[in-house]
């Protein structure tokens, strides 16, 4: 019995030791836990409202899907007159922008030119209309918009709510 306890304690210590601190190339310890920013439901609602206002001002009808950093739907909204599949399209676009960490218009160009067809095989939707939501160089979610000028609508909303947070870097 004592032998099993010793083996169990040793195994636990070996498994947990890497979590305490890891060395980086510079020799500094990396923390075992990092803090992340997440979009709140109020923030997501504000994005949807700002995008809807932009669309109305530009005489457009849109549907909007906003995901948190883990891909969970935080907010969705379809303006009156939006097509029956508009929310689904906005959601697919948002998921694609989140997974690839880039605007879906960039993904569309990559697929159309044949540089990378992976997005089409991975059930992504590389059509323009979605952006990653970046705050302080950290992706906190993604916003997909179905309707004309979807990325312009999303960027206007992100700029409005997050006071012109930097656009995601293209790779």
Q: Residues of each region from the PLM?
A:
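Bacterial N-terminal signal peptides
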Residues: 8-18
